[in-house]
Regions:
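C-terminal binding/interaction regions
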Residues: 2-24, 29-103
């Protein structure tokens, strides 16, 4: 399930410009989707780098959401009450708007 979710997240990051209006195609260098398995949840971390002046936070957020939706889709037969919550930008370096780190 997690491997399929990683692949889905990578595809989502690469295709963000087709999903989000006014987003443009970026020259993505690397995409890393990882998961932390907790007792009551799965945490997804998406890390993306690109060769350009624009940030990749929308691509990372899109990758995270699609990865989690894939897990939901593949596990809904076990529990339809799963909740996808608290998606947020944790760290951004570079880009036109500068750096950001969540508190």
């Amino acid at each position: 399930v997690l491997t399929v979710a990683q692949i889905a997240g990578i595809q989502a990051a690469k295709n963000t410009s087709m999903l989000i209006p006014l987003a443009h195609q970026l020259n993505i260098i690397s995409i890393n989707i990882s998961f932390k398995i907790k007792e009551d949840r799965v945490e997804c971390i998406s890390e993306i780098t690109c060769d350009g002046k624009t940030g990749v936070e929308i691509e990372a957020l899109c990758a995270t959401q699609i990865s989690l939706l894939t897990i939901y889709d593949m596990c809904k037969y076990i529990d339809k009450s799963m909740i996808i919550s608290e998606t947020k930008l944790v760290l951004k370096e570079g880009g036109k708007s500068g750096s950001y780190k969540a508190e």
